[in-house]
Amino acid sequence: MADGSKVFKKTSPDGKITVYLAKRDYVDHVEFVEPVDGMIVIDPEYQKEKKVFVMMTCAFRYGRDDMELIGLSFRKDIYVQSCQVHPPLPGEKKALTPLQEKLKAKLGGNSFPFSFNMATNLPCSVTLQPGPEDSGKACGVDFEVKGFWGDDVEEKNSKKNVARLIIRKVQYAPETSGAAPHAEITKQFMMSDKPLQLEASLNKEIHYHGEPIIVNVKINNSTNKIVKKIKITVEQITDVVLYSLDKYTKVVCCEEMNDTVAANSAFTKAYQVTPLLANNREKRGLALDGKLKHGDTNLASSTTLRPGMDKEVMGILVSYKIRVNLMASRGGILGDLISSDVSVELPLILMHPKPAEGTTSAEDVVIEEFARQKLQGEQDDEEDKEEAS
């Protein structure tokens, strides 16, 4: 059984509808996105007189829940796709996927298939980290699949009759990458005949979350100043492009080195920096992958755009850069009072590696309740509380 195909399920609070999905994360390959397909089990009583629908929604939330109580809505649906699963509409019958066939055999005649194809221009799942005192749902882009009944797909339903699941749209690092970033600068100081040269480079273009980043620093100090401080910072730049032109820059890693470079000397060294969410828990507005407070959440991955894609529909764009900064000053007690900064910037692409291809050829299907884990190891029941309210 452990080698079976894992399937996730979520049941409505009234127990009448259960939605099954093969995965929680759906990969955006830039040219296409993995289809969202699954099965929905409907109580026989519902099948007699009710229509049952499945809907997938991509939404952008850019305000707090409590503001909606006074009539202000800070949620915008970017993309909505729905289908009627019962009674099935004529002419819409599609071939079942291999996993749907296994689920159909396991779940019986009260189960019905559904499938959605995401548009390629949708944003990936991103959450903006709230501050310590913030409450309610976090701002960001999320995807939801829900099963519900009603006379019409637009009908407002009781939360007790809805089975809702939050899924994620993710991007993985491409199998091929470009040239490793490199930058250099030459700085001429007053009272010095020769300049200071700073050169910085990375070993590769794409880095994975949690992987140490090697920053190669080369300094040719032909001046009469002393380089007293070398600082390397990793910055996250978040462009909120859907409703405004807001841009947020957050330092996610900062390392100050004790190395010094004397006047008229050269210096070469490779440093390691590792930006981690664990060191940035309190930073409000930091972009994270997917929904917050889950054990598999990390700093947001760099956004990859298809050529010609409209950036505005992407909602939130995330990028990173590494800054290498030198503080140069004259010797003596008063030297630091007239110090000068010399810096270069390197682009950084931070992503997840593409996981190994899974298999759905096993005979058994392992069904797991659709619940992620909080960072503290407790079940995330935020959605269940909302549905029961």
UniProtKB/Swiss-Prot annotation:
<dbReference type="GO" id="GO:0002031">
    <property type="term" value="P:G protein-coupled receptor internalization"/>
</dbReference>
<keyword id="KW-0716">Sensory transduction</keyword>
<dbReference type="Pfam" id="PF02752">
    <property type="entry name" value="Arrestin_C"/>
</dbReference>
<dbReference type="InterPro" id="IPR017864">
    <property type="entry name" value="Arrestin_CS"/>
</dbReference>
<dbReference type="InterPro" id="IPR011021">
    <property type="entry name" value="Arrestin-like_N"/>
</dbReference>
<dbReference type="GO" id="GO:0001664">
    <property type="term" value="F:G protein-coupled receptor binding"/>
</dbReference>
<dbReference type="InterPro" id="IPR011022">
    <property type="entry name" value="Arrestin_C-like"/>
</dbReference>
<dbReference type="InterPro" id="IPR014753">
    <property type="entry name" value="Arrestin_N"/>
</dbReference>
<protein>
    <recommendedName>
        <fullName>Arrestin-C</fullName>
    </recommendedName>
</protein>
<dbReference type="InterPro" id="IPR000698">
    <property type="entry name" value="Arrestin"/>
</dbReference>
<dbReference type="InterPro" id="IPR014752">
    <property type="entry name" value="Arrestin-like_C"/>
</dbReference>
<dbReference type="GO" id="GO:0007601">
    <property type="term" value="P:visual perception"/>
</dbReference>
<dbReference type="GO" id="GO:0007165">
    <property type="term" value="P:signal transduction"/>
</dbReference>
<dbReference type="Pfam" id="PF00339">
    <property type="entry name" value="Arrestin_N"/>
</dbReference>
<dbReference type="InterPro" id="IPR014756">
    <property type="entry name" value="Ig_E-set"/>
</dbReference>
<comment type="function">
    <text>May play a role in an as yet undefined retina-specific signal transduction. Could bind to photoactivated-phosphorylated red/green opsins.</text>
</comment>
<comment type="similarity">
    <text>Belongs to the arrestin family.</text>
</comment>
<keyword id="KW-0844">Vision</keyword>
